[in-house]
Amino acid sequence: MSKEQYIEFPEEYTRRELNARYREIPLKDTTSRLLRKYFNAMANLYGIIPLHKAKEIVFSLSPKLVTEDEFLAFAEIARHECEGYYILGGDELYTDVKHTKPLEREIIDVTLIGESIDLFIETKRSQQEKPYYVPDKKHLLEYDDPFYCEDTPEKTALRRFMEERLGLSGEKLEDAFDDLLYGVRSVSSSVEGVLSHFDK
């Protein structure tokens, strides 16, 4: 059973306090910034990813970046960041989970938890038993931008359609494309909902 009414999020620390805690690990500022980019990118790309899988991806793409202890220490502090993700365990999301081990916590895109956790639950259900697409390091880190979309022939064709057929250009095209991209990525979107963007 989910904690629909009240989720107690970890306390948010100031940037100064966060930096001081990261240095206690000790992590260089560049290392903590890179890990933060990884976490944001994974939240944007996957929506939800367990820390043990995030660790596996970071270790495969940046093998000498951190040790397992440093990764866990970073994740514990990062729970107190104000970023595009939460790091929460089942014990914080559900009433029937007593304790979540640190590596079982999940990096969760902030858009999946609002007044309810229905989007989170729906996303988690849709991910079951599916493999993770893991791009190379450069491409994964591009997902740090929540509106990043890989350049594909389909993206080019859609943008051309929006320009030529819908008469969109400049900022209006960018806004419409971002809205459409967000709608497509949302697990709760329907075909009708996505197509309604073309009526605007």
Residue ranges: model-predicted function:
Residues 4-24, 30, 73-135:
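Charged low-complexity interaction tracts in eukaryotic proteins
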Residues 23-50:
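Positively charged, polyanion-binding regions of nucleic-acid-associated proteins
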Residues 49, 64-65, 169:
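Short coil/loop linkers at secondary-structure junctions
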Residues 130-200:
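Extended alpha-helical interaction scaffolds used for oligomerization/partner binding
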